[in-house]
Amino acid sequence: MTHSTGTLYIISAPSGAGKSSLVKALTDTNPDIRVSISHTTRAMRPGEVDGVNYHFVTREEFVKMGEHGDFLERAEVFGNFYGTSQSRLQQTLDEGHDLILEIDWQGAEQVRKLMPQARSIFILPPSLQALHQRLTNRGQDSDEIIDGRMREAVSEMSHYVEYDYLIINDDFAHALDDLKAIFRANQLQQKRQQVRFGKLLAELLG
C-alpha cells in the first residue's frame, strides 16, 4: 500500500465559532491529519506555545520573510500579521498527509488562486448571541475588543458562500462528526484509493 499526495483543507470561521477546538479534536483522533502552523506577529495567548500554535515573530521578521517570498498567503487581522510558509506546506502534502490551513477568508482567497485543488470549509456559530457569549467566556478581551470582533464576524461570515462545505457548530459532537465526514469522504475518492491500493487492484483484476 502506497500513499497519494495529501489534500489541503482551508478552514475558516469567525473568532469564537469553535474552529480551533474542532480542529484539535479532529487531529487528536486522526494523527495523519496535520495542521499548518502559521507565522504571526500577534502576542502569545495564555497556554499557547511557540512552534505549536503559531510561529511567533516580530513585525520586522515577518516583513523580511515576505520580501523573500516565503509566504503562500498573508493577511492583516486586528492589526496583526499572519502568514503561511509555502515550502513547509508543500512538503507535508508530498509526504501524503492531509493538511489543515486555518486562515480567514482573505487568506483563503489567495490560497485558492495558487492551489485550486484545495478543499474549503467554513464554520458558523448557531447565532450571534452564542458567538458573543463564547467571546465573553474567553475572559481574554475587553468589551471594546469583543465588540470589534463581533463587527468583524458579521463581515467575515458573509463569505461562507465562497467555500465548498458549511458546518454549523451548534452541538460540538455533531459538528465534529460533520468535519470527520468531509475528510473521510475525500480519503475514499477513487483516485486516492487507486494509489493507496494499487497492488490489490492489480491482483483483483488479474
Curated annotation (Swiss-Prot):
Where along the chain is ATP bound? 13-20
| Entries under Gene3D superfamilies matching the protein | Guanylate Kinase phosphate binding domain (3.30.63.10), P-loop containing nucleotide triphosphate hydrolases (3.40.50.300)
Keyword ATP-binding found: yes
Origin, by domain of life? Answer: Bacteria
Catalytic activity from the UniProt record: GMP + ATP = GDP + ADP
Record Pfam families: Guanylate_kin
Q: One GO cellular component from the entry?
A: cytosol
* UniProt-listed CDD domains: GMPK (cd00071)
Q: Iron among the record's keywords?
A: no
This entry's Gene Ontology molecular function terms read: ATP binding; guanylate kinase activity
Q: Which UniProt keywords apply?
A: ATP-binding, Cytoplasm, Kinase, Nucleotide-binding, Transferase
Q: Where in the cell is it found?
A: Cytoplasm
EC no.? Answer: 2.7.4.8
Q: Where is the Guanylate kinase-like domain?
A: 6-184
What does this chain do?
Essential for recycling GMP and indirectly, cGMP.
The family line of this record is:
Belongs to the guanylate kinase family.
> What is this protein's record name?
Guanylate kinase
Which source organism?
A: Pseudomonas fluorescens (strain Pf0-1)
